[in-house]
């Protein structure tokens, strides 16, 4: 079991895919890492040697991943909310931040519908 950046990589997957289980590493970053280390992307994680795993660890350590990345993202969002800019206000109100419409849709961000009752006139 290869453990890199505090994440156990799935044994039966290709290294290219296995690296994407690390938060902050996607397919393109994974391919860059493999190109630099000289490891074949089609190799299975279980077939990696200790030397190759050490190379991968060393290369992944150059990137900001897992807890550090999550912490930085959280700090950036908190900073936006503290300075009170438009994006910060949208984060605070749990609304879409990037200009999407909210008259309809935006249910993922807003949560389930809150039906407003209608008063009947007597």
UniProtKB/Swiss-Prot annotation:
This protein's source sits in the domain of life called Bacteria
Q: Which GO terms describe its cellular component?
A: cytosol; small ribosomal subunit
Q: Which SUPFAM superfamilies match?
A: S13-like H2TH domain (SSF46946)
Query: Which Gene Ontology BP terms does the record give?
Result: translation
Annotated segments matching region Disordered: 96-122
Cite the entry's keywords alphabetically. Ribonucleoprotein, Ribosomal protein, RNA-binding, rRNA-binding, tRNA-binding
* Gene Ontology MF terms in the entry: rRNA binding; structural constituent of ribosome; tRNA binding
Which PANTHER family does the UniProt record give? 30S RIBOSOMAL PROTEIN S13/40S RIBOSOMAL PROTEIN S18, SMALL RIBOSOMAL SUBUNIT PROTEIN US13M
Which protein family is named in the record? Belongs to the universal ribosomal protein uS13 family.
The record's function comment reads:
Located at the top of the head of the 30S subunit, it contacts several helices of the 16S rRNA. In the 70S ribosome it contacts the 23S rRNA (bridge B1a) and protein L5 of the 50S subunit (bridge B1b), connecting the 2 subunits; these bridges are implicated in subunit movement. Contacts the tRNAs in the A and P-sites.
The subunit structure is:
Part of the 30S ribosomal subunit. Forms a loose heterodimer with protein S19. Forms two bridges to the 50S subunit in the 70S ribosome.
NCBIfam families per the record? Answer: uS13_bact
* Protein name per its UniProtKB record: Small ribosomal subunit protein uS13
Q: Which organism is it from?
A: Halothermothrix orenii (strain H 168 / OCM 544 / DSM 9562)
